[in-house]
Amino acid sequence: MEKLLLLGDEAIAQGFIDAGGSAINSYPGTPSTQITEYVINSKQAKEQGVIANWCANEKTALEASIGVAYAGKRAMTCMKHVGLNVCGDPFMNAAIIGTKVVLVVVADVPSMFSSQDEQDSRFYGHWAMIPMLEPSNQQEAYDMVHYGY
């Protein structure tokens, strides 16, 4: 396997591509924007036919990924913490019925650095009774996304 030097967002995107991801649907918002941009600009993703979409908001992005997952393909949605509030309804519905979709929330937990508010979205994972992972470095970010599929 080729060794790469990647930022955290890039490691998440590369893990998705290497896992055979089919579609990424996102709403732009720093710092999660870089994940989707990496997929859009990736030669490997283009060769694999990965579809990347910017959506009207986080709710429609997650709903699009849920639709892809219903079709049996691997999908991911990326957003920052406040976006999770916007897509709360489809998030809980997907958790209840067991939809296999990966949701990546970036720039979370107290001590905000890239947002207008501060929240701890880990409570969403507990509330929905779904796995919630917290990588501590780029390799863990890659591995968690790659093996998560």
Where are these regions (language model features)?
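Thiamine diphosphate
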Residues: 1-140, 145
